[in-house]
């Protein structure tokens, strides 16, 4: 199966991409998948891509459009879903209400 050049070029130009880079050796895949689900549910249709990227060495990072918005070591632990949603919202749609989270 091939993707037409139009579709491929449009998808590569899309912004609003999240990458959750997690330590597979530490068994953090489920935590990463849960956070991805939370982001996709909250920003339904607004996020174009959420990627889970396995790694090693205790890594847990969340990237938004190439910008590091959460790092486990720097931020002293894992993000709560609420905090991660607020950071994403504040960077992409500062005026967007998050309902009961705000």
What would you call each of these model-derived segments?
Residues 1-102:
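Domain-level signature for proteins that mediate thiol-based redox and metal-cofactor handling
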């Amino acid at each position: 199966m091939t993707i037409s050049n139009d579709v491929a070029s449009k998808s590569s130009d899309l912004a609003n991409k999240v990458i959750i880079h997690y330590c597979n050796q530490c068994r953090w895949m489920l935590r990463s998948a849960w956070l991805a689900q939370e982001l996709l549910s909250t920003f339904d249709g607004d996020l174009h891509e959420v990627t889970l990227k396995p790694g090693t060495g205790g890594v847990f990072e969340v990237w938004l459009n190439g910008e590091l918005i959460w790092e486990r070591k720097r931020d002293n632990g894992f993000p709560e879903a609420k905090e991660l949603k607020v950071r994403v919202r504040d960077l992409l749609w500062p005026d967007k209400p998050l309902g009961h989270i705000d």
